[in-house]
Amino acid sequence: MSNKVKSDIEIASKAEILPVTTIAEHLGLDADALELYGKYKAKLSYDTIHSLKDKETGKLVLVTAINPTPAGEGKSTVTVGLGDALSKKDKKTVIALREPSLGPTMGIKGGATGGGYAQVIPMEDINLHFTGDFHAITAANNALSAFIDNHMQQGNDLDIDGRRIVWKRVVDLNDRALRKVVVGLGGPIQGVPREDGFDITVASEIMAIICLASDLKDLKKRLSEIVIGYNYKKEPITVGEMGYEGALTLLLKDALKPNLVQTLEHTPAIVHGGPFANIAHGCNSVSATSTALRLGEYVVTEAGFGADLGAEKFLDIKVPALGKAPDCVVIVATIRALKMHGGALKTELSEENVDALAKGFTNLQKHTESIQTFGIPYVVAINKFITDSDAEVAKLEALCEEHGIPFSLTEVWEKGGDGGLELADKVIAAVESGEADYKRIYDDAWSIEEKLEAIVTKVYGGIGVELSSKAQKQIVEFKKYGWDRYPICMAKTQYSLSDDPTLLGRPTDFVIHIREFIPKLGAGFVVALTGDVMTMPGLPKKPAALNMDVDENGNAQGLF
Protein backbone atom coordinates (compact mmCIF):
# COMPACT_ATOMS: atom_id res chain seq x y z
CA MET A 1 0.00 0.00 0.00
CA SER A 2 1.06 3.58 -0.59
CA ASN A 3 2.70 5.46 2.28
CA LYS A 4 0.46 8.43 1.52
CA VAL A 5 -2.41 8.62 3.99
CA LYS A 6 -5.60 8.57 1.96
CA SER A 7 -8.95 9.74 3.23
CA ASP A 8 -11.75 7.25 3.75
CA ILE A 9 -13.70 8.65 0.82
CA GLU A 10 -10.63 8.36 -1.44
CA ILE A 11 -10.16 4.72 -0.48
CA ALA A 12 -13.85 3.91 -0.82
CA SER A 13 -14.26 5.66 -4.18
CA LYS A 14 -11.41 3.66 -5.73
CA ALA A 15 -12.52 0.30 -4.35
CA GLU A 16 -13.81 -2.52 -6.52
CA ILE A 17 -17.47 -2.87 -5.60
CA LEU A 18 -19.44 -5.95 -6.57
CA PRO A 19 -23.13 -5.98 -7.48
CA VAL A 20 -25.18 -6.62 -4.36
CA THR A 21 -26.68 -9.64 -6.13
CA THR A 22 -23.19 -11.19 -6.12
CA ILE A 23 -22.84 -10.51 -2.39
CA ALA A 24 -26.22 -12.19 -1.87
CA GLU A 25 -24.97 -15.24 -3.79
CA HIS A 26 -22.14 -15.55 -1.24
CA LEU A 27 -24.89 -15.99 1.35
CA GLY A 28 -26.82 -18.52 -0.67
CA LEU A 29 -29.50 -16.02 -1.71
CA ASP A 30 -30.70 -15.42 -5.25
CA ALA A 31 -31.78 -12.10 -6.78
CA ASP A 32 -35.42 -12.72 -5.89
CA ALA A 33 -34.48 -12.49 -2.21
CA LEU A 34 -33.58 -8.83 -2.67
CA GLU A 35 -35.39 -5.54 -3.18
CA LEU A 36 -32.79 -3.53 -5.08
CA TYR A 37 -31.89 0.10 -4.43
CA GLY A 38 -29.57 0.45 -7.41
CA LYS A 39 -26.71 -1.97 -8.13
CA TYR A 40 -24.97 -1.93 -4.75
CA LYS A 41 -27.68 -1.69 -2.08
CA ALA A 42 -30.67 -3.87 -1.36
CA LYS A 43 -33.22 -4.69 1.25
CA LEU A 44 -33.90 -8.28 2.23
CA SER A 45 -37.54 -9.12 1.53
CA TYR A 46 -39.94 -10.31 4.21
CA ASP A 47 -40.26 -13.64 2.39
CA THR A 48 -36.49 -14.08 2.65
CA ILE A 49 -36.41 -13.24 6.34
CA HIS A 50 -39.30 -15.59 7.11
CA SER A 51 -37.70 -18.42 5.13
CA LEU A 52 -34.62 -18.28 7.37
CA LYS A 53 -36.36 -18.43 10.74
CA ASP A 54 -35.88 -22.14 11.32
CA LYS A 55 -32.21 -22.20 10.31
CA GLU A 56 -29.52 -22.85 12.91
CA THR A 57 -27.84 -19.71 14.19
CA GLY A 58 -24.14 -18.95 13.86
CA LYS A 59 -21.69 -17.58 16.42
CA LEU A 60 -22.11 -14.00 17.63
CA VAL A 61 -19.23 -11.62 18.34
CA LEU A 62 -20.00 -8.26 19.96
CA VAL A 63 -17.56 -5.36 19.52
CA THR A 64 -17.53 -2.67 22.21
CA ALA A 65 -14.92 -0.25 23.57
CA ILE A 66 -13.52 1.72 26.47
CA ASN A 67 -14.89 5.20 27.19
CA PRO A 68 -14.03 7.11 24.01
CA THR A 69 -12.55 10.42 22.98
CA PRO A 70 -14.93 12.73 21.04
CA ALA A 71 -13.53 11.38 17.75
CA GLY A 72 -14.34 7.76 18.60
CA GLU A 73 -11.95 4.83 18.96
CA GLY A 74 -12.68 2.84 15.81
CA LYS A 75 -15.31 0.33 16.90
CA SER A 76 -16.90 0.22 13.44
CA THR A 77 -13.46 -0.01 11.84
CA VAL A 78 -12.49 -2.96 14.05
CA THR A 79 -15.88 -4.60 13.47
CA VAL A 80 -15.40 -4.43 9.70
CA GLY A 81 -11.73 -5.42 9.85
CA LEU A 82 -12.46 -8.38 12.12
CA GLY A 83 -15.23 -9.49 9.79
CA ASP A 84 -12.86 -9.37 6.83
CA ALA A 85 -10.19 -11.21 8.82
CA LEU A 86 -12.64 -13.97 9.75
CA SER A 87 -13.55 -14.26 6.07
CA LYS A 88 -9.85 -14.72 5.31
CA LYS A 89 -9.87 -17.52 7.91
CA ASP A 90 -12.51 -19.27 5.78
CA LYS A 91 -15.31 -18.49 8.20
CA LYS A 92 -18.56 -17.58 6.46
CA THR A 93 -18.93 -14.16 8.05
CA VAL A 94 -21.62 -11.49 8.07
CA ILE A 95 -21.18 -8.06 9.64
CA ALA A 96 -24.17 -6.39 11.31
CA LEU A 97 -23.85 -2.63 11.82
CA ARG A 98 -25.98 0.41 12.58
CA GLU A 99 -26.78 3.04 9.97
CA PRO A 100 -25.03 6.41 10.42
CA SER A 101 -26.98 9.47 11.53
CA LEU A 102 -26.70 12.68 9.51
CA GLY A 103 -26.32 14.69 12.71
CA PRO A 104 -22.86 13.40 13.71
CA THR A 105 -21.88 12.96 10.04
CA MET A 106 -22.39 16.68 9.44
CA GLY A 107 -21.21 17.56 12.93
CA ILE A 108 -18.05 15.93 14.24
CA LYS A 109 -17.59 12.40 12.87
CA GLY A 110 -17.87 13.07 9.14
CA GLY A 111 -19.18 9.53 8.57
CA ALA A 112 -19.60 6.22 10.37
CA THR A 113 -18.90 3.34 8.02
CA GLY A 114 -15.55 2.27 9.41
CA GLY A 115 -12.27 3.77 8.29
CA GLY A 116 -9.16 3.31 6.19
CA TYR A 117 -9.10 -0.12 4.58
CA ALA A 118 -11.85 -1.45 6.85
CA GLN A 119 -15.04 0.14 5.55
CA VAL A 120 -18.50 -0.78 4.38
CA ILE A 121 -19.44 0.49 0.93
CA PRO A 122 -20.96 2.31 -0.92
CA MET A 123 -19.67 4.61 1.81
CA GLU A 124 -21.11 7.83 0.39
CA ASP A 125 -24.62 6.42 0.07
CA ILE A 126 -24.63 4.78 3.51
CA ASN A 127 -23.44 7.97 5.23
CA LEU A 128 -26.06 10.16 3.56
CA HIS A 129 -29.57 8.94 2.74
CA PHE A 130 -28.93 5.20 2.19
CA THR A 131 -32.28 3.44 1.61
CA GLY A 132 -34.36 6.10 3.35
CA ASP A 133 -34.91 4.29 6.66
CA PHE A 134 -34.17 7.31 8.84
CA HIS A 135 -36.41 9.52 6.71
CA ALA A 136 -39.26 7.03 7.12
CA ILE A 137 -38.72 6.97 10.88
CA THR A 138 -38.63 10.77 10.99
CA ALA A 139 -41.85 10.93 8.94
CA ALA A 140 -43.64 8.42 11.17
CA ASN A 141 -42.51 10.18 14.35
CA ASN A 142 -43.64 13.59 13.12
CA ALA A 143 -46.88 12.22 11.69
CA LEU A 144 -47.72 11.09 15.21
CA SER A 145 -46.99 14.61 16.49
CA ALA A 146 -49.34 16.00 13.84
CA PHE A 147 -52.02 13.48 14.83
CA ILE A 148 -51.71 14.53 18.48
CA ASP A 149 -52.03 18.24 17.74
CA ASN A 150 -54.90 17.62 15.34
CA HIS A 151 -56.72 15.55 17.98
CA MET A 152 -56.49 18.44 20.42
CA GLN A 153 -57.68 20.91 17.78
CA GLN A 154 -60.62 18.74 16.72
CA GLY A 155 -62.38 18.43 20.07
CA ASN A 156 -59.83 16.47 22.16
CA ASP A 157 -62.07 13.47 22.88
CA LEU A 158 -59.29 11.81 24.91
CA ASP A 159 -58.83 14.91 27.09
CA ILE A 160 -55.10 15.09 26.28
CA ASP A 161 -53.42 17.54 28.62
CA GLY A 162 -51.21 19.70 26.40
CA ARG A 163 -48.92 20.36 29.37
CA ARG A 164 -48.23 16.64 29.75
CA ILE A 165 -47.50 15.53 26.19
CA VAL A 166 -44.20 13.63 26.26
CA TRP A 167 -43.99 12.85 22.54
CA LYS A 168 -41.54 15.14 20.71
CA ARG A 169 -40.88 15.87 17.07
CA VAL A 170 -37.55 14.75 15.55
CA VAL A 171 -35.07 15.64 12.82
CA ASP A 172 -31.92 13.70 11.88
CA LEU A 173 -29.59 16.64 12.49
CA ASN A 174 -27.78 18.25 15.40
CA ASP A 175 -29.90 21.38 15.95
CA ARG A 176 -29.79 22.85 19.46
CA ALA A 177 -32.19 25.68 18.51
CA LEU A 178 -35.01 23.13 18.28
CA ARG A 179 -34.61 21.63 21.75
CA LYS A 180 -37.52 23.68 23.09
CA VAL A 181 -40.15 25.26 20.84
CA VAL A 182 -43.74 26.49 21.04
CA VAL A 183 -46.26 25.19 18.49
CA GLY A 184 -49.83 26.15 17.63
CA LEU A 185 -49.29 29.93 17.61
CA GLY A 186 -51.26 32.26 15.34
CA GLY A 187 -54.82 32.10 16.56
CA PRO A 188 -57.63 29.53 16.93
CA ILE A 189 -57.39 28.04 13.43
CA GLN A 190 -53.63 27.34 13.77
CA GLY A 191 -53.93 24.80 16.57
CA VAL A 192 -53.66 24.65 20.34
CA PRO A 193 -50.56 26.48 21.61
CA ARG A 194 -48.25 24.32 23.71
CA GLU A 195 -44.61 23.76 24.51
CA ASP A 196 -42.90 21.14 22.36
CA GLY A 197 -39.37 20.17 21.39
CA PHE A 198 -37.27 18.19 18.95
CA ASP A 199 -35.02 15.20 19.55
CA ILE A 200 -32.57 13.81 17.03
CA THR A 201 -34.18 11.00 15.02
CA VAL A 202 -31.93 8.33 16.50
CA ALA A 203 -33.36 9.14 19.95
CA SER A 204 -36.94 8.56 18.76
CA GLU A 205 -38.81 5.69 20.36
CA ILE A 206 -39.78 4.65 16.85
CA MET A 207 -36.08 4.11 16.05
CA ALA A 208 -35.81 1.82 19.07
CA ILE A 209 -39.00 0.02 18.07
CA ILE A 210 -37.70 -0.60 14.53
CA CYS A 211 -34.56 -2.05 16.09
CA LEU A 212 -36.37 -4.34 18.54
CA ALA A 213 -39.44 -5.45 16.54
CA SER A 214 -39.31 -9.02 15.25
CA ASP A 215 -41.77 -8.59 12.37
CA LEU A 216 -44.62 -6.38 11.09
CA LYS A 217 -47.11 -7.75 13.60
CA ASP A 218 -44.74 -7.03 16.48
CA LEU A 219 -43.98 -3.59 15.00
CA LYS A 220 -47.68 -2.66 14.97
CA LYS A 221 -48.16 -3.94 18.53
CA ARG A 222 -45.17 -1.97 19.80
CA LEU A 223 -46.31 1.21 18.03
CA SER A 224 -49.74 0.89 19.68
CA GLU A 225 -48.07 0.81 23.12
CA ILE A 226 -46.24 4.15 22.76
CA VAL A 227 -47.24 6.55 25.54
CA ILE A 228 -47.74 9.99 23.95
CA GLY A 229 -48.74 11.84 27.11
CA TYR A 230 -51.37 12.04 29.82
CA ASN A 231 -54.96 13.22 30.16
CA TYR A 232 -56.29 15.72 32.69
CA LYS A 233 -56.66 12.90 35.22
CA LYS A 234 -52.91 12.20 34.78
CA GLU A 235 -53.65 8.84 33.15
CA PRO A 236 -51.37 7.68 30.28
CA ILE A 237 -52.61 7.83 26.70
CA THR A 238 -51.23 5.47 24.05
CA VAL A 239 -51.11 5.43 20.27
CA GLY A 240 -53.49 2.47 20.39
CA GLU A 241 -56.11 4.59 22.13
CA MET A 242 -55.74 7.21 19.41
CA GLY A 243 -55.98 4.57 16.68
CA TYR A 244 -52.96 5.47 14.56
CA GLU A 245 -50.78 2.35 14.87
CA GLY A 246 -51.92 1.12 11.46
CA ALA A 247 -50.94 4.33 9.69
CA LEU A 248 -47.55 4.40 11.42
CA THR A 249 -46.90 0.77 10.48
CA LEU A 250 -47.74 1.63 6.87
CA LEU A 251 -45.13 4.41 6.89
CA LEU A 252 -42.53 2.04 8.35
CA LYS A 253 -43.21 -1.21 6.47
CA ASP A 254 -40.12 -0.91 4.26
CA ALA A 255 -37.90 0.64 6.93
CA LEU A 256 -38.26 -2.58 8.95
CA LYS A 257 -36.46 -4.60 6.26
CA PRO A 258 -32.67 -4.96 6.78
CA ASN A 259 -30.23 -3.53 4.22
CA LEU A 260 -27.50 -5.58 2.51
CA VAL A 261 -24.20 -4.03 1.39
CA GLN A 262 -20.53 -5.12 1.49
CA THR A 263 -17.10 -4.30 2.89
CA LEU A 264 -14.10 -3.21 0.83
CA GLU A 265 -13.09 -6.89 0.82
CA HIS A 266 -16.62 -8.03 -0.15
CA THR A 267 -17.68 -9.48 3.18
CA PRO A 268 -21.50 -9.21 3.37
CA ALA A 269 -22.71 -6.47 5.71
CA ILE A 270 -26.26 -6.01 6.97
CA VAL A 271 -26.63 -2.37 8.01
CA HIS A 272 -29.89 -1.45 9.70
CA GLY A 273 -31.16 0.89 12.40
CA GLY A 274 -29.12 3.40 14.32
CA PRO A 275 -30.05 4.37 17.88
CA PHE A 276 -27.31 6.17 19.83
CA ALA A 277 -26.02 4.34 22.89
CA ASN A 278 -25.82 7.39 25.17
CA ILE A 279 -29.47 8.45 24.73
CA ALA A 280 -31.01 5.19 23.44
CA HIS A 281 -30.05 1.49 23.43
CA GLY A 282 -27.27 1.76 20.83
CA CYS A 283 -27.64 -1.48 18.84
CA ASN A 284 -28.56 -2.34 15.28
CA SER A 285 -31.86 -4.08 14.66
CA VAL A 286 -32.87 -7.46 16.03
CA SER A 287 -34.10 -8.27 12.53
CA ALA A 288 -30.67 -7.56 11.02
CA THR A 289 -28.70 -9.50 13.64
CA SER A 290 -31.15 -12.42 13.63
CA THR A 291 -31.04 -12.64 9.83
CA ALA A 292 -27.24 -12.42 9.81
CA LEU A 293 -27.02 -15.24 12.36
CA ARG A 294 -28.98 -17.49 10.02
CA LEU A 295 -26.89 -16.59 6.99
CA GLY A 296 -23.38 -16.73 8.45
CA GLU A 297 -21.16 -18.99 10.48
CA TYR A 298 -19.84 -15.94 12.34
CA VAL A 299 -21.63 -12.61 12.86
CA VAL A 300 -19.70 -9.56 14.03
CA THR A 301 -21.81 -6.72 15.40
CA GLU A 302 -21.16 -3.64 17.52
CA ALA A 303 -22.86 -1.59 20.21
CA GLY A 304 -22.34 2.14 20.58
CA PHE A 305 -19.76 3.97 22.68
CA GLY A 306 -18.16 2.14 25.62
CA ALA A 307 -19.05 -1.13 27.32
CA ASP A 308 -20.81 0.87 30.05
CA LEU A 309 -23.40 2.02 27.51
CA GLY A 310 -23.86 0.03 24.29
CA ALA A 311 -22.61 -3.32 25.55
CA GLU A 312 -24.63 -3.18 28.78
CA LYS A 313 -27.77 -2.37 26.79
CA PHE A 314 -27.00 -5.04 24.20
CA LEU A 315 -26.66 -7.61 26.97
CA ASP A 316 -29.57 -6.48 29.15
CA ILE A 317 -32.05 -5.21 26.52
CA LYS A 318 -31.25 -6.61 23.07
CA VAL A 319 -30.21 -10.16 23.98
CA PRO A 320 -33.61 -11.06 25.50
CA ALA A 321 -35.32 -9.78 22.33
CA LEU A 322 -32.81 -11.51 20.05
CA GLY A 323 -32.79 -14.79 21.95
CA LYS A 324 -29.04 -15.16 21.48
CA ALA A 325 -26.13 -13.92 23.61
CA PRO A 326 -22.64 -13.17 22.28
CA ASP A 327 -20.14 -16.01 22.24
CA CYS A 328 -17.28 -13.51 22.59
CA VAL A 329 -16.87 -9.78 23.19
CA VAL A 330 -14.13 -7.64 21.65
CA ILE A 331 -13.21 -4.52 23.63
CA VAL A 332 -11.59 -1.86 21.45
CA ALA A 333 -8.93 0.20 23.21
CA THR A 334 -6.76 2.96 21.82
CA ILE A 335 -3.61 4.46 23.22
CA ARG A 336 -4.92 8.00 22.71
CA ALA A 337 -8.09 7.33 24.74
CA LEU A 338 -6.13 5.67 27.54
CA LYS A 339 -3.80 8.69 27.65
CA MET A 340 -6.85 10.94 27.94
CA HIS A 341 -8.11 8.82 30.84
CA GLY A 342 -4.67 9.14 32.39
CA GLY A 343 -4.78 12.93 32.43
CA ALA A 344 -3.30 13.93 29.08
CA LEU A 345 -4.90 16.97 27.47
CA LYS A 346 -7.08 16.32 24.44
CA THR A 347 -4.80 18.61 22.42
CA GLU A 348 -1.78 16.45 23.33
CA LEU A 349 -3.09 12.95 22.60
CA SER A 350 -0.82 12.59 19.57
CA GLU A 351 2.28 13.16 21.72
CA GLU A 352 4.07 10.27 23.43
CA ASN A 353 3.06 9.99 27.09
CA VAL A 354 3.70 6.56 28.57
CA ASP A 355 2.91 7.71 32.12
CA ALA A 356 -0.56 8.96 31.16
CA LEU A 357 -1.16 5.72 29.29
CA ALA A 358 -0.30 3.68 32.37
CA LYS A 359 -2.59 5.78 34.57
CA GLY A 360 -5.47 5.52 32.09
CA PHE A 361 -5.15 1.74 31.84
CA THR A 362 -7.56 1.42 34.77
CA ASN A 363 -10.42 2.43 32.48
CA LEU A 364 -9.76 -0.59 30.27
CA GLN A 365 -9.48 -2.83 33.32
CA LYS A 366 -12.93 -1.79 34.52
CA HIS A 367 -14.53 -2.59 31.16
CA THR A 368 -12.94 -6.05 31.08
CA GLU A 369 -14.32 -6.72 34.55
CA SER A 370 -17.79 -5.57 33.49
CA ILE A 371 -17.88 -7.95 30.53
CA GLN A 372 -16.77 -10.80 32.80
CA THR A 373 -19.73 -9.97 35.06
CA PHE A 374 -21.98 -11.01 32.16
CA GLY A 375 -20.14 -14.33 31.87
CA ILE A 376 -18.74 -13.86 28.37
CA PRO A 377 -15.10 -14.35 27.25
CA TYR A 378 -13.43 -11.29 25.75
CA VAL A 379 -10.42 -10.13 23.76
CA VAL A 380 -9.02 -6.59 23.81
CA ALA A 381 -8.32 -5.16 20.36
CA ILE A 382 -5.61 -2.51 20.60
CA ASN A 383 -6.64 -0.37 17.63
CA LYS A 384 -3.30 1.02 16.43
CA PHE A 385 -3.07 4.61 15.25
CA ILE A 386 -0.18 6.04 13.23
CA THR A 387 0.52 8.45 16.11
CA ASP A 388 1.16 5.60 18.59
CA SER A 389 4.83 5.32 19.54
CA ASP A 390 6.64 1.99 19.87
CA ALA A 391 7.18 2.69 23.57
CA GLU A 392 3.47 3.26 24.12
CA VAL A 393 2.49 0.10 22.27
CA ALA A 394 5.03 -1.92 24.25
CA LYS A 395 3.79 -0.45 27.54
CA LEU A 396 0.14 -1.25 26.80
CA GLU A 397 0.98 -4.79 25.73
CA ALA A 398 3.03 -5.27 28.91
CA LEU A 399 0.18 -3.99 31.08
CA CYS A 400 -2.27 -6.37 29.43
CA GLU A 401 0.09 -9.31 29.94
CA GLU A 402 0.74 -8.31 33.55
CA HIS A 403 -2.99 -8.30 34.34
CA GLY A 404 -3.85 -11.43 32.37
CA ILE A 405 -5.90 -9.56 29.77
CA PRO A 406 -6.08 -11.31 26.36
CA PHE A 407 -5.27 -8.81 23.61
CA SER A 408 -4.28 -8.36 20.00
CA LEU A 409 -2.55 -5.42 18.34
CA THR A 410 -4.91 -4.63 15.48
CA GLU A 411 -4.03 -2.71 12.32
CA VAL A 412 -7.16 -3.07 10.21
CA TRP A 413 -7.36 0.66 9.41
CA GLU A 414 -4.04 0.40 7.57
CA LYS A 415 -4.13 -3.20 6.35
CA GLY A 416 -7.79 -4.23 6.18
CA GLY A 417 -8.51 -7.84 7.07
CA ASP A 418 -4.81 -8.70 7.03
CA GLY A 419 -4.35 -6.37 10.00
CA GLY A 420 -6.84 -8.35 12.07
CA LEU A 421 -5.77 -11.95 11.49
CA GLU A 422 -4.32 -12.41 14.98
CA LEU A 423 -7.46 -10.88 16.48
CA ALA A 424 -9.55 -13.29 14.40
CA ASP A 425 -7.54 -16.24 15.72
CA LYS A 426 -8.08 -15.16 19.32
CA VAL A 427 -11.78 -14.54 18.75
CA ILE A 428 -12.20 -17.98 17.17
CA ALA A 429 -10.38 -19.56 20.11
CA ALA A 430 -12.59 -17.72 22.60
CA VAL A 431 -15.76 -18.70 20.73
CA GLU A 432 -14.73 -22.34 20.38
CA SER A 433 -13.70 -22.53 24.04
CA GLY A 434 -17.37 -22.72 24.95
CA GLU A 435 -16.71 -20.54 27.99
CA ALA A 436 -19.64 -18.20 27.34
CA ASP A 437 -22.12 -18.46 30.21
CA TYR A 438 -24.33 -15.41 29.71
CA LYS A 439 -26.24 -13.94 32.61
CA ARG A 440 -28.05 -10.61 32.90
CA ILE A 441 -27.07 -8.40 35.79
CA TYR A 442 -30.69 -7.91 36.86
CA ASP A 443 -34.07 -9.56 36.47
CA ASP A 444 -37.11 -7.79 35.01
CA ALA A 445 -39.02 -8.56 38.22
CA TRP A 446 -36.62 -6.40 40.23
CA SER A 447 -37.67 -2.89 41.25
CA ILE A 448 -36.48 0.13 39.28
CA GLU A 449 -34.20 1.07 42.17
CA GLU A 450 -32.65 -2.42 42.23
CA LYS A 451 -32.03 -2.38 38.49
CA LEU A 452 -30.37 1.03 38.70
CA GLU A 453 -28.17 -0.14 41.58
CA ALA A 454 -27.11 -3.21 39.60
CA ILE A 455 -26.06 -1.17 36.57
CA VAL A 456 -24.28 1.50 38.58
CA THR A 457 -22.39 -0.83 40.92
CA LYS A 458 -21.63 -3.75 38.58
CA VAL A 459 -20.97 -1.92 35.31
CA TYR A 460 -20.03 1.67 36.16
CA GLY A 461 -18.19 0.97 39.41
CA GLY A 462 -20.20 3.53 41.37
CA ILE A 463 -21.68 3.20 44.84
CA GLY A 464 -25.33 3.97 44.12
CA VAL A 465 -27.92 6.32 42.67
CA GLU A 466 -29.49 9.59 43.75
CA LEU A 467 -33.05 10.20 42.55
CA SER A 468 -34.48 13.67 42.03
CA SER A 469 -37.86 14.38 43.62
CA LYS A 470 -39.42 14.10 40.16
CA ALA A 471 -37.81 10.69 39.58
CA GLN A 472 -39.02 9.47 42.99
CA LYS A 473 -42.60 10.49 42.18
CA GLN A 474 -42.34 8.82 38.78
CA ILE A 475 -41.28 5.51 40.33
CA VAL A 476 -44.45 5.51 42.45
CA GLU A 477 -46.51 6.24 39.32
CA PHE A 478 -44.71 3.60 37.24
CA LYS A 479 -45.35 0.93 39.88
CA LYS A 480 -49.06 1.75 39.73
CA TYR A 481 -49.11 1.07 35.99
CA GLY A 482 -46.77 -1.94 36.11
CA TRP A 483 -44.04 -0.13 34.21
CA ASP A 484 -41.43 -1.06 36.80
CA ARG A 485 -41.15 -4.51 35.14
CA TYR A 486 -39.36 -3.06 32.10
CA PRO A 487 -35.55 -3.01 31.63
CA ILE A 488 -33.70 0.25 32.26
CA CYS A 489 -32.04 2.16 29.42
CA MET A 490 -29.57 4.63 30.91
CA ALA A 491 -29.09 7.97 29.15
CA LYS A 492 -25.60 8.96 30.25
CA THR A 493 -22.46 10.67 29.01
CA GLN A 494 -20.26 8.38 26.95
CA TYR A 495 -17.01 9.96 28.09
CA SER A 496 -16.99 8.76 31.69
CA LEU A 497 -18.06 5.74 33.71
CA SER A 498 -19.92 8.28 35.85
CA ASP A 499 -22.50 10.87 34.76
CA ASP A 500 -19.84 13.61 34.86
CA PRO A 501 -18.03 13.81 31.49
CA THR A 502 -14.96 15.35 33.15
CA LEU A 503 -14.49 12.44 35.57
CA LEU A 504 -12.18 10.25 33.51
CA GLY A 505 -10.18 7.08 34.15
CA ARG A 506 -11.73 4.73 36.69
CA PRO A 507 -13.54 6.90 39.20
CA THR A 508 -14.74 5.43 42.50
CA ASP A 509 -17.16 6.40 45.27
CA PHE A 510 -19.46 8.25 42.87
CA VAL A 511 -23.24 8.22 42.59
CA ILE A 512 -25.33 8.47 39.43
CA HIS A 513 -27.91 11.24 39.52
CA ILE A 514 -31.26 10.32 37.95
CA ARG A 515 -33.19 13.46 37.06
CA GLU A 516 -36.23 11.82 35.42
CA PHE A 517 -37.56 8.75 33.65
CA ILE A 518 -39.17 8.45 30.22
CA PRO A 519 -41.43 5.43 29.68
CA LYS A 520 -40.83 3.94 26.23
CA LEU A 521 -43.28 1.07 26.41
CA GLY A 522 -43.32 0.40 22.68
CA ALA A 523 -39.57 -0.12 22.76
CA GLY A 524 -40.00 -2.11 25.95
CA PHE A 525 -37.79 -0.15 28.32
CA VAL A 526 -37.72 2.85 30.65
CA VAL A 527 -35.13 5.54 29.93
CA ALA A 528 -33.34 6.99 32.95
CA LEU A 529 -31.98 10.46 32.22
CA THR A 530 -28.76 11.20 34.13
CA GLY A 531 -26.64 14.29 34.55
CA ASP A 532 -26.94 16.82 31.73
CA VAL A 533 -27.27 14.38 28.82
CA MET A 534 -29.39 15.79 25.99
CA THR A 535 -31.54 14.02 23.40
CA MET A 536 -30.86 16.70 20.78
CA PRO A 537 -27.13 17.34 20.24
CA GLY A 538 -25.65 20.61 19.01
CA LEU A 539 -23.06 21.27 16.33
CA PRO A 540 -19.40 22.07 17.14
CA LYS A 541 -17.90 25.46 16.32
CA LYS A 542 -16.48 24.08 13.07
CA PRO A 543 -18.77 21.31 11.83
CA ALA A 544 -17.39 18.59 9.58
CA ALA A 545 -19.86 19.90 6.99
CA LEU A 546 -17.50 22.84 6.34
CA ASN A 547 -15.19 20.44 4.48
CA MET A 548 -17.91 18.66 2.50
CA ASP A 549 -18.63 19.29 -1.15
CA VAL A 550 -19.45 17.59 -4.42
CA ASP A 551 -17.44 17.76 -7.66
CA GLU A 552 -18.78 18.46 -11.14
CA ASN A 553 -19.39 14.75 -11.65
CA GLY A 554 -21.51 14.40 -8.53
CA ASN A 555 -18.84 12.68 -6.42
CA ALA A 556 -18.87 13.41 -2.70
CA GLN A 557 -15.91 15.12 -1.05
CA GLY A 558 -15.08 15.56 2.62
CA LEU A 559 -16.75 12.49 4.09
CA PHE A 560 -14.38 10.59 6.40
UniProtKB/Swiss-Prot annotation:
Assigned keywords, A-Z: ATP-binding, Ligase, Nucleotide-binding, One-carbon metabolism
GO BP terms: tetrahydrofolate interconversion
Enzyme Commission number(s) of this protein: 6.3.4.3
Pathway: One-carbon metabolism; tetrahydrofolate interconversion
PROSITE patterns named in the record: FTHFS_1, FTHFS_2
Reactions this protein catalyses: (6S)-5,6,7,8-tetrahydrofolate + formate + ATP = (6R)-10-formyltetrahydrofolate + ADP + phosphate
Root EC class: ligase
Name of a matching Pfam family: FTHFS
A single MF term (Gene Ontology): ATP binding
InterPro entries: Formate_THF_ligase, Formate_THF_ligase_CS, P-loop_NTPase
Binding, ATP: 69-76
Homology family: Belongs to the formate--tetrahydrofolate ligase family.
Protein name: Formate--tetrahydrofolate ligase
Taxonomy of the source species: Bacteria, Bacillati, Bacillota, Bacilli, Bacillales
